[in-house]
């Protein structure tokens, strides 16, 4: 009541926003005579003037009126298009970081040039986001003359570009591309191995076209970069055959190749064991004669040996796992229950599979992932435009903090939206649609029939073929071809069947596309020939208007009112006539699930017969209520996805920030020293627990681990025997001093710059490996966390708690692994230090899958987009394909 009274007194929020912006429109219009008087050179010089004024302290808001007036004049001179006043308002809404709802045909592509130009003045870049590659290329080419006239550069990004081309494209002032491509490039940049490998600049300002499609419909599934794990089955099998030849050391001082630590569930090679396994590896031709297992090029081989040793020494059949249906299934050590689907990480599961002689599975691992919600919220400023956003205004505000401003049309809307017709059966409904299409054909009125699925569009196509009605079918598969067909859907008598997303972004012009007709003329066509084409188009245009404009037929109500409005919005552009009607049946999915009982009983009471429709406001209201319920359900699903992804997003930001800072470092000494101190402290605390009695200490095990894992000779038992009053802190200091001394020897051999390069490569490589394993662990946690609800626990809180625990564990393991590798690997030349970096770069060339599974029902035609690069497998002892002359394992295959 009170809110209604306030609206009557002051107007709605939308009306107040429009009134405020009308004052700015007057200011822009006041600049128009001045702009018209400028020469082309003077007009082009405005950009430099604006940049200087911005650098001298003027804000973009203060420059807005003059900048918009400049763009409008340039657009008129280059494209012959002058921005309407309502388009200026749309540009202001976008500049303020909100969503402009503009009807179909109101010129959203042209509107984007206003805020794009204004924000490009800052020099920090503008990203314009489209729904497909065709629109990115089309819009960039179409608007390019405006930007280039004003001295700005324009880039466009698409999947098949080379790395260098993409870097150049991102350097442009204004970049066009798809949401998927921007997201994948962000993820790839955070998998890069050096700053020079990155392509994106700062995420400054994004203008998202069809914002409802991108930020809502496609937001239910994340972007994922996954890579098939290297097929190392043969290597696991070969190393598995060597491990039984190693002998366990039963007691300290006895002969033996390895020791076991049951407390930590670890197995370590002794000095004799290192020599023995090197000898066995050489005989198996996995290691060159005289080559050390600890050479930089053999890090991954060492990893396989450790995994196989652990599988044989520490993991036992029917205790730690069982073998069932040719698979190794883990047994939970606490409950004794099997855990199908769970796998040990770091190659251990594959090593156990090799030991048991079952098939070795190579998993498709997630390398990086992000949701669109979290990706687009990283931009300093985000805005969007669409023809249908108001029904989702609450979600835009809640998730993205974006206000929806409904922009009035330039000309009054005269489209006639007819009431829904509801039939008892689908057969009756489709027969009625055929009759409507046939009647339109008699009048030569163009028809667009919208369907909710490819299956429905193909079924309808078959019915039209039986009736000998010519038509075109669009299924949202070939964007460029679609755009051409949809542009011609306004020709007299044209019949087009389209799934809801097909051809979105292209206007249906009554009479067909004049631009396409002119483009089909020969390059040297005379003005007279062009005039003939224009007259023919005008004749067709007038014929369609006389027939009633474009007819929209909906074959089924969608789950979202917004998608229905998008279909209706195809007609009635820029004041054109048009009409729309939805044909429904009680057998349609939405009606069957949500509204059939109520509407069905109503139809029975009215004595409806097969073939007779019902047309009533109560029916329309019942359907809209069903749609509201479903919209609320889908919002809850997306909100829940975001709640969970926010936990992962916090961790992602920490990892990516750390990764970028490490890449930027020239000297990593401080980072490594900090890691070393933490690792040594943690090791001592494990074997000599704080606040414990000396009887609880295990100094020999500590010495063994330091020797076997880190190559540090620390006689901890001797220190304790000589000084019974020695404290754990003193032991830590002694061990740390030995670790520093041991490492300083390596530094002296090759120099600090070389060692820093090697350290950086190892840190990044290890970080990527552990992050990948962590993502898999987070996926597993997410899949089962809802079961905590049965124990009266909040699954989200439990997920946060356990995710934090996993993250802490991952960071601890990361530090341990980095220090272990740096301490044990031998670096003799600068070339050794570059081996890891070269191999990591080669990883980028290997097979990588980019996925965005759009499970949203709103885009029924979309499928998983998977891009693959297939390459022949290279053997470890084959010549490296880079042409160095070395074996693959000693060059780019060193860590594979």
From Swiss-Prot:
Biased composition annotated in UniProt, kind: Basic and acidic residues: 866-876
Cofactor note: May bind 1 zinc ion per subunit.
Key word DNA-binding present: no
Membrane topology: Peripheral membrane protein
Cell compartments where the protein resides: Cell inner membrane; Cytoplasm
Enzyme Commission designation: 7.4.2.8
GO cellular component terms listed in the entry, alphabetical order: cell envelope Sec protein transport complex; cytosol; plasma membrane
GO molecular function, one term: metal ion binding
Reaction catalysis annotation: ATP + H2O + cellular proteinSide 1 = ADP + phosphate + cellular proteinSide 2
Subunit-level organization: Monomer and homodimer. Part of the essential Sec protein translocation apparatus which comprises SecA, SecYEG and auxiliary proteins SecDF-YajC and YidC.
Task of the protein: Part of the Sec protein translocase complex. Interacts with the SecYEG preprotein conducting channel. Has a central role in coupling the hydrolysis of ATP to the transfer of proteins into and across the cell membrane, serving both as a receptor for the preprotein-SecB complex and as an ATP-driven molecular motor driving the stepwise translocation of polypeptide chains across the membrane.
Protein name according to UniProt: Protein translocase subunit SecA
Species lineage: Bacteria, Pseudomonadati, Pseudomonadota, Gammaproteobacteria, Legionellales
Gene name linked to the record: secA
């Amino acid at each position: 009541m009170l809110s209604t009274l306030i609206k009557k007194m002051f107007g709605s929020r939308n009306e107040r926003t429009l009134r405020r912006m009308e004052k700015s429109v007057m200011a822009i219009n006041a600049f128009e005579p001045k702009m018209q008087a400028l020469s082309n050179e003077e007009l082009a010089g405005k950009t430099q003037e604006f940049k200087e004024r911005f650098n001298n302290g003027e804000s973009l808001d203060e420059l807005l009126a003059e900048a918009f007036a400049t763009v409008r004049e340039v657009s008129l001179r280059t494209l012959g298009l002058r921005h309407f006043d309502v388009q200026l308002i749309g540009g202001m809404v976008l500049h303020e970081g909100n969503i402009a709802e503009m009807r179909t045909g109101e010129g959203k592509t042209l509107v984007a040039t206003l805020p794009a130009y204004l924000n490009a003045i800052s020099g920090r870049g503008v990203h314009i986001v489209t729904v497909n590659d065709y629109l990115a290329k089309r819009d960039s080419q179409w608007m390019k003359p405006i930007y280039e006239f004003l001295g700005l550069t324009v880039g466009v990004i698409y999947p098949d570009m080379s790395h260098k081309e993409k870097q150049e494209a991102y350097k442009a002032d204004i970049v066009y591309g798809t949401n998927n491509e921007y997201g994948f490039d962000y993820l790839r940049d955070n998998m890069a191995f050096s700053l020079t490998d990155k392509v994106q600049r700062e995420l400054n300002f994004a203008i998202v076209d069809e914002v409802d499609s991108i930020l809502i419909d496609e937001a239910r599934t994340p972007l994922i970069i996954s890579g098939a794990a290297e097929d190392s089955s043969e290597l696991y099998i070969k190393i598995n055959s060597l491990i039984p030849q190693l002998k366990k050391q039963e007691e300290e001082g006895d002969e033996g190749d390895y020791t076991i630590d049951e407390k930590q569930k670890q197995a370590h090679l002794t000095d004799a064991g290192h020599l023995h396994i090197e000898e066995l590896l050489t005989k198996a031709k996995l290691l060159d004669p005289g080559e050390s297992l600890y050479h930089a090029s053999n890090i991954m081989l060492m990893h396989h040996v450790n995994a196989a040793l652990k599988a044989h020494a520490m993991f036992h059949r029917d205790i730690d796992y069982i073998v069932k249906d040719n698979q190794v299934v883990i047994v939970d050590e606490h409950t004794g229950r099997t855990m199908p689907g769970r796998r040990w990480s770091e190659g251990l599961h594959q090593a156990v599979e090799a030991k048991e002689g079952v098939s070795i599975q190579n998993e498709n691992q997630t390398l990086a992932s992000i949701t669109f919600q979290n990706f687009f919220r990283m931009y300093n400023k985000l805005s969007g435009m669409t023809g249908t956003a108001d029904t989702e205004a609450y979600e835009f505000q809640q998730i993205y903090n974006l206000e929806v401003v409904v922009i009035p049309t330039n000309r009054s809307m005269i489209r006639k939206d007819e009431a829904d017709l509801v039939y008892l059966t689908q057969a009756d409904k489709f027969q009625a649609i055929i009759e409507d299409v046939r009647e339109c054909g008699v009048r030569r009125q163009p028809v667009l029939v919208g369907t909710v699925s490819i299956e429905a569009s193909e079924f309808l196509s078959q019915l039209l073929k039986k009736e000998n009605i010519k038509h075109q079918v669009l299924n949202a598969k070939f964007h460029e071809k679609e755009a051409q067909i949809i542009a011609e859907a306004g020709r007299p008598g044209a019949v087009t069947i389209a799934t809801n997303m097909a051809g979105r972004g292209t206007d249906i012009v009554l009479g067909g596309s004049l631009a396409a007709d002119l483009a089909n003329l020969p390059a040297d066509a005379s003005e007279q020939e062009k005039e003939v084409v224009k007259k023919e188009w005008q004749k067709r245009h007038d014929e369609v208007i006389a027939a009633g404009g474009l007819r929209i037929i909906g074959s089924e109500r969608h789950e979202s009112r917004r998608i229905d409005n998008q279909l209706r919005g195809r007609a009635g552009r820029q004041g054109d006539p048009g009409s729309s009607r939805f044909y429904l049946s009680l057998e349609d999915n939405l009606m069957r699930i949500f509204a059939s009982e109520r509407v069905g009983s109503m139809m029975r009471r009215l004595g409806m017969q097969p073939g007779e429709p019902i047309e009533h406001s109560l029916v329309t209201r019942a359907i809209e209520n069903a749609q509201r319920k479903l919209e609320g359900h889908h919002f809850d699903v997306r909100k829940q996805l975001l709640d969970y992804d926010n936990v992962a997003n916090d961790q992602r930001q920490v990892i990516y920030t750390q990764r970028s800072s490490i890449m930027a470092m020239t000297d990593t000494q401080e980072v490594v020293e900090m890691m070393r101190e933490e690792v040594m402290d943690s090791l001592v605390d494990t074997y000599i627990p704080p606040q414990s009695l000396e009887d609880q200490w295990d100094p020999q095990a500590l010495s063994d681990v330091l020797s076997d894992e880190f190559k540090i000779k620390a006689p901890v038992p001797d220190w304790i025997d000589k000084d019974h009053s020695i404290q754990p802190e003193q032991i830590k200091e002694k061990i740390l001093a030995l670790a520093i001394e041991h490492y300083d020897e390596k530094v002296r051999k090759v120099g600090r710059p070389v060692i820093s390069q090697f350290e950086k490569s190892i840190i990044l490589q290890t970080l990527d490996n552990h992050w990948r394993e962590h993502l898999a662990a987070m996926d597993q946690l997410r899949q089962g966390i809802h079961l905590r609800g049965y124990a009266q626990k909040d699954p989200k809180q439990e997920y946060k708690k356990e995710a934090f625990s996993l993250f802490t564990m991952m960071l601890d393991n990361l530090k341990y692994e980095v220090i272990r590798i740096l301490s044990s690997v031998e670096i003799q030349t600068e070339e050794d230090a570059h081996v890891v970096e070269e191999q990591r770069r080669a990883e980028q060339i290997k097979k990588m899958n980019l996925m965005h599974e759009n499970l949203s029902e709103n885009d029924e035609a979309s499928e998983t987009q998977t891009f693959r690069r297939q390459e022949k497998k290279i053997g470890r002892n084959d010549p490296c394909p880079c042409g160095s002359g070395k074996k693959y394992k000693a060059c780019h295959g060193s860590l594979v």
